[in-house]
Amino acid sequence: MFRWIPEATQEQKQRVAAELSRLPALLPVLRAYHMGADLGIDEGNFDWAAAADFDDREGYLTYRDNPEHRAIIAEFIRPIIAERAAVQYEF
């Protein structure tokens, strides 16, 4: 989950989604990949979230460490992020 900096533009936020949306075609370890902006129903929520499903821990590590994924983080996410939260769990 991300909380954007106040200066983040709509174009920058849309670019994050567009760039991350390319990853399922590049990374077969991604079994499901969903993302979107908070609906604004409750105050205090994060602004945006992504959820990814993997078969196993190794799949997650492949995604996490993928150079293309890392480049998206560095180029498009880090410049506009105020706060990040994440969790990995088994179901």
Provide a role label for each language-model segment.
Residues 53-54, 80:
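Conserved catalytic core of Hanks-type protein kinase domains
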Residues 24, 68-73:
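A common structural junction motif
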Residues 75-91:
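Charge-dense polyanion-binding interfaces
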Residues 1-47, 55-65, 88-91:
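Short S/T/G/P-rich N-terminal loop/turn motif that feeds into the first structured element of a domain
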Residues 66-69, 79:
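A short linear boundary/processing microfeature
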